[in-house]
From Swiss-Prot:
Active site location: 80, 142
Positions with a binding annotation for Zn(2+) 2: 110, 143, 354
Enzyme class: hydrolase
Residues annotated for Zn(2+) 1 binding in this entry: 78, 110, 167
Protein family per UniProt: Belongs to the peptidase M20A family. ArgE subfamily.
PROSITE patterns on file: ARGE_DAPE_CPG2_1, ARGE_DAPE_CPG2_2
Domain of life: Bacteria
Keyword Transport appears in the UniProt entry: no
Protein name per UniProt: Acetylornithine deacetylase
């Protein structure tokens, strides 16, 4: 089998739905994408290892390896996309559409299209002349739980020297980002008729106390922690969603608040979760059994790569761009657990990610192909 042309690689990847979602009716297995990539990389002489990701809806990781042993380069990306709003897209999300020097489609830059760039680079390199292994990692569920990357980190089955995650950065190398925590605070009171407030326990009134404590915690985070690489240097705490009660004439029996916290490098998510619980301790003591604090999903740690890394110096040389920090999250903290220097760098703009009519600007194709090819040659040859 001869590998398709670059545009056909892209078209085939976009054609296959691979949405991940916490809503079961939207969640789709990524196996067809994994099988497609497996066939293509096999054709190039890579050995293939496909593993199921535990506790997922039929999700799989793929590791394609050319060469033996540890070291070398890992090029990593995720096979899933976010869901899409059919009413807002003006083009078919699963059909690669060319218009105004752009390729439109779901996953063009976030980030199935990255694998087409990697395949094209591998086609143009004499892989038999590489001295160190080249690995390609395709993961699952990055857009939800990061279960695929977590499984790879837990397995510790290989150890590259360097890793590049091809998320859309405009090919500007990223060396740092904050983490992400989604936490829930549930208040369980006692409902009753609103004509006799003393005959119940109003969960909204307790939640009012909770928000007061959390506002104090916001100030504490700003005063005690800082990473000056970020425009907003402190760990943040955002009030994202609140719901309580069902009728004006009932004492509210339950109320739930969802918050977002963003740890900075050097601050463990467990530390922030402990501070959250400490802030709420007076209320927990005042209302025994009424306050429940729990993770909506497992936290994602912050990430930072040492700026003295040879990988950073190489990426800056190849792109002509200095490394930057970003505010969004990637799989970098989990890939980094393999023991390798890790950066995030890929084609496309983050401004198009998770947006209707997601697109890749065609002017980025040739420069990106050249950079990825040179990156492989520089890291996998002595």
């Amino acid at each position: 089998m001869q590998l398709p042309q670059f545009s056909e690689l892209y078209k085939s990847l976009i054609l296959i739905p691979s949405i991940s979602s916490l809503e079961k009716e939207l969640d789709i297995s990524n196996k067809p994408v994994i099988d497609l990539l497996s066939g293509w990389f096999s054709e190039l002489g890579f050995s293939i290892n496909i593993t199921s990701v535990p506790e997922t809806n039929g999700k799989f990781n793929l590791v394609a390896t050319y060469g033996q042993g540890d070291g070398g380069l890992l090029l990593a990306g995720h096979t899933d996309t976010v869901p899409f709003d059919d009413d807002l897209w003006t083009k078919d999300p699963f059909k690669l559409t060319e218009k105004d020097d752009k390729w439109y489609g779901l996953g063009t830059i976030d980030m199935k299209g990255f694998f087409a760039f990697v395949l094209e680079a591998c086609k143009n390199i004499d892989l038999t002349k590489l001295d160190k292994p080249l690995r390609i990692l395709a993961t699952a569920d990055e857009e939800t739980t990061m279960a695929g990357a977590r499984a790879i980190a837990a397995a510790q089955s290989f150890r590259p020297d360097y890793a590049v995650i091809g998320e859309p950065t405009g090919m500007v190398p990223v060396f740092m980002h904050k983490g992400h925590m989604s936490e829930a605070i549930r208040i369980t009171g006692r409902s009753g008729h609103s004509s006799d407030p003393a005959n119940g326990i109003n969960a909204i009134e307790i939640m009012h106390q909770v928000t007061g404590q959390l506002l104090q915690l916001q100030r504490k985070l700003k005063e005690q922690y800082a990473c000056d690489h970020f425009v907003i240097p402190q760990p943040t705490l955002n009030f994202g969603h609140v719901h309580g009660g069902d009728s004006p004439n009932r004492i509210c029996g339950s109320c739930e608040l969802h918050i977002d916290m963003r740890p900075i490098p050097g601050v463990n998510p467990d530390e922030l979760f402990m501070l959250l619980n400490q802030a709420l301790l007076p209320i927990i003591k005042q209302w025994p059994g009424a306050v429940d604090v729990y993770h909506l999903h497992e936290p994602i740690p912050a990430y930072a790569c040492n700026t003295d890394s040879a990988l950073i110096k190489l990426a800056e040389k190849l792109t002509g761009e200095a490394v930057i920090p970003v505010n969004y999250c990637t799989e970098a903290p989990f890939i980094q657990q393999l023991g390798c220097d890790t950066i995030v760098m890929g084609p496309g703009s983050i401004n198009q990610a998770h947006q209707p009519d997601e697109y890749l600007d065609l002017s980025a194709i040739k420069p990106t192909q050249a950079i990825i090819q040179k990156l492989i040659e520089e890291t996998c040859k002595n």
